[in-house]
Amino acid sequence: MAEETQGADAVPQISFKKRTNKAKANFRKKPDTPPPASDSDSDFTSSDDEEGRRIKRRRKNAAVTASSTTAGPRRNVVEDQPATETAAIPLTSSNDATKHSNWYDEELSEKNLLGTTRARPASNTQSAPDGTYKGAANYSSFIQKNPNAPTKQFGPIKAPTNVRTVTVMDFAPDVCKDWKQTGFCGFGDSCKFLHAREDYKQGWELDREWEIGTKGKQLSGRVVSKRSGDAKTAEDDEDDDDEELLESIPFACIICKSSYKSPIVTKCGHYFCESCALQRYRKNPSCAACGAGTGGVFNVAKKLNHLLDKKRERARKLREQAIAEGEEVSSDEEGDEES
C-alpha cells in the first residue's frame, strides 16, 4: 500500500485553462472565399452546403458568352517596388594596363627553339644480329639523335635574349689582280674576287679630302652636263657599238699585261700582242686565254687597231678640254693617251 501511495503522488497534476468570452471575441476567423469575377465565363457553379462550405459543380449546358468589356487583353500591373541593395562584387586585380603580346606560340618556347646544353645520352647497345634477313623496313639506323636538340629547324628562329650581337659591314673588297691589270680573268664569273678597277676610299677619307680641297675657297656652281633635245645621229650609234665592243675585249694583253703592240687575233677570237703570241707559240701552241689550239694562225686585228685609235683620239680631246677648263688630269688618262 505504501508503494501505491508513493506512485500516485509521483504523477503530476494537470490543470486545463478555459477560454474566456473576451478571448473568444478577439479570435480571428478565416474569411469566406470570395465568388469568382464572372460566373458566366466559367463552366462551374457554386453553392453553399449545410455547414457553410462552398461546393463547385460543372454546368450541364454551358454556353460561351462574350462582351466588349471582357474581350480586352488583361494587363498585369506590376507595382513599383523599392530597389533592393545588391551584393557587392569583389574586385580582382588584372594586368590589363601592362599586358603585352608575344608572337611566339606556346609550342615555340625557348627550350624548343634553342634546346638545352646537356650532354648527349649514351647510345643504347643493340643486340647483335642473328643473321636473319628481315626486309628493308627493319634496317637499323646508326644515326644518334640528340633529344635535347631544338624541334624547330626551319623558319624564323628565336634569338637568345641574353646575347646582343652587333654586325658591321665594311666595304673593303679583295680586287682580282688579273682583272684590274688586263681586264681578263680565267675564272670568269666564278672568281671569288671583285672584278673592278676603281680605287675605293672610306667615307671619312672622301669627306676629309673634300674639306681640304674646298677650305678657304668660294664654291661656284657650273653646268656639268646639258641635256640636248636633238635626236641621236648615226655617228653616236656607231660610237656606242664601238664602246660595247671595247668593253668585251681586254684593254691590255694578258701575256705581257701592257697595252697592245701590233695586236693580232686568234681563231677563237682572243687578242694578243704579235710578239707575245709568237713567243708563246714556240713553247705552247695553245691559246693563252681559253687553251684552244691556235694552229699557228694569227690574223692582224685591223678592227681593234681602228677602235684603239678612236679611243686614243677621244681621250686626247677630253684631256685638252679638261686642261682648258682648269681641271686636273689624272695619270691614268695621260697613260691612255700615250698608249
Curated annotation (Swiss-Prot):
GO biological process: mRNA processing; snoRNA splicing
Keywords for the protein's UniProt record, in alphabetical order: DNA-binding, Metal-binding, mRNA processing, mRNA splicing, Nucleus, Spliceosome, Zinc, Zinc-finger
Localization: Nucleus
Entry keyword RNA-binding: no
Protein family membership: Belongs to the CWC24 family.
Assembly and binders: Associated with the spliceosome.
Protein's recorded name: Pre-mRNA-splicing factor cwc24
UniProt source species: Aspergillus fumigatus (strain ATCC MYA-4609 / CBS 101355 / FGSC A1100 / Af293)
Lineage: Eukaryota, Fungi, Dikarya, Ascomycota, Pezizomycotina
